[in-house]
């Protein structure tokens, strides 16, 4: 019995220790490292790269001969000379064709395919940045909701203390019941705000959990940029050349591919010189074939289509450059403004706390009304909530800046590596 008792006590102590142990922090960097290499979106982008590689090989294959096996059988024939009649048996044979000269059409098509492959490589990098930005936004939103709940819970605790004091007064003075009801109404309003934040937190965590192998708890979230100052952000994660952003690089590669596609289409309208040959059991022949589409209405419109696509790609690239530059500048402005606001709000919170304490003391000696105390409490809660939201804006602005520089992957510790895949 003693042994059983000791074991039971040990088990209870171990259970209590495990229950009181802090939950393992789930950092934003950990989430990004898990997803930016293995998420379905990233794997899809990698598959597109592999598909582009295969299309490049398809274009190169135009330089190689095409060999086919044939079988022919005459169903009906008429010749004036009886010696021209051939057998009605199935005649097996081989045909081959190889391009000798195409005025650079094949080479341009290969260049276009290679440029499209480059486009998909940059799109893969841009997809990682986009996914990292989405996960980062969800993470920061969940963190903001948790901090807002903490602010409102402190406000709720202060309202509960006011109610406790009023309950004691009410026992001796029933005429002050209206004050009790007024304070209780304010407390219920705070509770409702907490419920709203909790609902938003649960929804955000639920969405965030799809990027993790298990459900993420709110108490495991932490500030991902707590140790990253604005100066360090600009020094370590700024592009020396704005054109190196993967989103811009993808647009530039796409524009070059469109230009090469137009050039290839124009060269396809020129003559093609092919070496052709065939062989059967009875006959063998080889020769040179020149093909030139002197009239092809569809080709004219294809060239026009390619030209229009180039114009669209050029404007899209300009818009991408403009948007990235604007977003980077706006992120810097928001970082600077948020830092200034945090300093002011910190002083405002300290002053509001003193006002609440003073009003509580003055209310106790009937020099302030309960409404004054409740309003002061509301101002304190608003200041604390504004501080929490401004912290969120600062973090979001840092994430925005990383995105405009294409540096989310680099910040999370993921290096750009050579893509080596072969999907079967």
What are the functions of these language-model segments?
Residues 44-59, 127, 131-154, 161, ...:
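Amphipathic alpha-helical coiled-coil segments
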Residues 23-68, 174-177, 209-259, 321, ...:
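Bacterial Sec-pathway N-terminal export signals of envelope proteins
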Residues 10-19:
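Bacterial N-terminal signal peptides
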Residues 2-3, 24, 216, 388-424:
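Acidic, low-complexity, intrinsically disordered peripheral segments
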Residues 33-43, 50-66, 94-112, 122-129, ...:
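A glycine-/polar-enriched beta->alpha junction
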């Amino acid at each position: 019995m003693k042994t059983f008792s000791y074991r039971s006590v040990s088990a209870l102590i171990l259970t209590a220790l495990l229950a009181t142990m802090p939950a393992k922090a789930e950092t934003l960097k950990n989430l990004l490292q898990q997803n930016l290499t293995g998420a379905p979106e990233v794997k899809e982008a990698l598959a597109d790269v592999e598909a582009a590689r295969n299309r490049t090989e398809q274009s190169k294959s135009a330089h190689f001969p095409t060999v086919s096996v044939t079988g022919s059988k005459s169903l009906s024939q008429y010749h004036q000379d009886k010696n021209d009649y051939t057998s009605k048996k199935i005649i097996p044979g081989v045909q081959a064709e190889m391009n000798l000269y195409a005025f650079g059409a094949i080479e341009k098509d290969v260049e276009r395919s290679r440029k499209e492959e480059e486009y998909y490589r940059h799109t893969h990098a841009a997809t990682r940045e986009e996914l990292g930005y989405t996960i980062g936004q969800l993470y920061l939103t969940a963190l903001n909701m948790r901090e807002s709940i903490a602010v409102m819970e402190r406000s709720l605790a202060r309202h509960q203390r006011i109610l406790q004091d009023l309950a004691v007064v009410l026992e001796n003075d029933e005429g002050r019941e209206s004050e009790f009801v007024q304070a209780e109404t304010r407390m219920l309003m705070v509770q409702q705000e907490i419920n709203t934040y909790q609902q938003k937190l649960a929804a955000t965590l639920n969405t965030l959990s799809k990027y993790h192998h298990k459900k993420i708890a709110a108490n495991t979230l932490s500030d991902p940029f707590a140790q990253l100052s604005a100066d360090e952000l600009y020094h370590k994660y700024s592009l020396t050349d704005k054109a190196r952003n993967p989103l811009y690089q993808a647009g530039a590669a796409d524009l070059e591919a469109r230009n090469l596609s137009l050039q290839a289409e124009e060269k396809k309208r020129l003559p093609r010189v092919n070496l052709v040959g065939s062989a059967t059991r009875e006959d063998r022949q080889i020769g040179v074939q020149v093909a030139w589409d002197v009239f092809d209405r569809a080709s004219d419109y294809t060239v026009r289509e390619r030209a229009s696509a180039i114009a669209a790609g050029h404007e899209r690239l300009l818009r991408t450059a403009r948007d990235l530059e604007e977003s980077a500048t706006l992120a810097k402005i928001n970082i600077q403004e948020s830092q200034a606001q945090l300093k002011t709000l910190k002083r405002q919170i300290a002053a509001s706390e003193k006002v609440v304490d003073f009003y509580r003391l003055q209310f106790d000696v009937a020099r302030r009304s309960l409404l004054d105390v409740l309003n002061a409490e509301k101002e304190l809660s608003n200041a604390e909530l504004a501080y929490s939201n401004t912290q969120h804006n600062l973090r979001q602005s840092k994430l925005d800046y990383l995105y405009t520089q294409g540096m989310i992957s680099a910040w999370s510790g993921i290096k750009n590596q050579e893509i080596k895949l072969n999907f079967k």
